[in-house]
Regions:
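A hydrophobic C-terminal alpha-helical subdomain
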Residues: 18, 230-288
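Oxidoreductase cofactor-interface core, primarily capturing Rossmann-like NAD(P)-dependent enzymes
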Residues: 2-27, 31-38, 52-55, 62, ...
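Aromatic "clamp/platform" in nucleotide-sugar-dependent glycosyltransferases that forms part
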Residues: 83-88
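Short, conserved active-site loop motifs that form the nucleotide-linked donor/cofactor pocket
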Residues: 43-44, 136
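Cofactor-binding loops of NAD(P)H-dependent oxidoreductases
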Residues: 49
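Short secondary-structure boundary segments
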Residues: 71, 107, 258
Length: 288
């Protein structure tokens, strides 16, 4: 039995569908029964649990051959990341109690970075569960291509996409959620010992200008990127409702300055197969 967190989302859904296609039993971990109904209809066992509740998580993880851990993203965390600290301890305690055979945690590129930023939340959770007497894999995917869902409307309507990734010709490690979910499902089904890190990106690194050019091709209209001035970010993010935008700003700095990358660089990462054009085509079709 494979217990899957985040099953109602993009990556968790791919993990579950990949396992089901391989005739593997899946336990869908959901917050409420209504969200689990579709997975129950697919033949999954359903476990009700929340990320804050150790007891329900331990029950959901118990007797699992593999557990896929996915923590909901927090884009506006409190200073010092107390939410991540609490989640890390809850997951650690639940895993100790349940003692599954192996664990795959969906972490992030740059989890090893020393500078504090939005992704430090994953650094904290990695540290919390890294000492478990259970085989643990930290799957560290690159920037998700699906983040370009925010770019669809400006590309279609104005032909100009604001970019926080800059310079616009700087290649950025990116990966599709489909590749991420498939790799996670594969990792769950293979035994290993101890702690390991798998770094994952797409077929090649992508520049913001390439994103614009791909939109232009798919939409059959001129599309270009426009860098959002760094000095305007804090005021802009606060105007959008963020209370503590500094971690997000520092994350963007990390990508732009190169200190958020893979430990082993591009040469040491595993490569997915899904191309940027495939992802953008899907986003356009869904009207994102």
């Amino acid at each position: 039995m494979y217990a899957i967190m985040g099953i109602t989302g993009q990556i968790g859904g791919v993990v579950a569908r990949t396992l089901l296609a391989a005739k593997q039993p899946v336990r869908a971990i959901v917050r409420d029964a209504i969200k689990g109904q579709a997975w129950s209809d697919r033949g999954c066992e359903v476990a009700l649990a929340t990320i804050e509740d150790r007891a329900s998580l331990a029950t959901a993880f118990r007797e699992a051959e593999g557990v896929f851990l996915l923590v909901p993203p927090s884009f506006d965390p409190l200073p010092e990341f107390p939410e991540a600290q609490a989640i890390g301890e809850t997951l650690r305690s639940a895993l100790v109690e349940a003692n599954p055979e192996r664990v795959v945690y969906l972490s992030t590129i740059g989890a090893q970075a020393k500078q504090s930023n939005l992704l430090t939340q994953h650094t904290i959770i990695e540290k919390a569960i890294s000492g478990l007497p259970i085989p643990v894999t930290f799957l560290r995917p690159a920037w998700f291509m699906e983040n370009s869902s925010w770019d669809v409307a400006p590309a279609m309507q104005q032909g100009v996409i604001p970019s926080f990734l800059q310079p616009l010709d700087r290649p950025v490690p990116m990966v599709a959620t489909a590749d991420t979910g498939k790799v996670a499902a594969g990792l769950l089904q293979v035994a290993w010992n101890g702690r390991r890190v798998i770094e994952l990106e797409g077929p090649h690194r992508v520049t913001p200008n390439e994103i614009a050019a791909t939109f232009a091709k798919l939409l059959d209209r001129p599309v270009r990127m426009e860098a959002v001035p760094r000095m305007s970010w804090e005021a802009l993010f606060k105007s959008q409702g963020m209370k503590n935008p500094i971690p997000r700003i520092r994350m963007l700095d990390g990508f732009n300055e190169g200190w958020i990358d893979f430990e082993r660089g591009e040469v040491g990462s595993q490569k997915g197969n899904v191309a940027l054009e495939t992802v953008l085509k899907g986003l356009i079709a869904r009207g994102h």
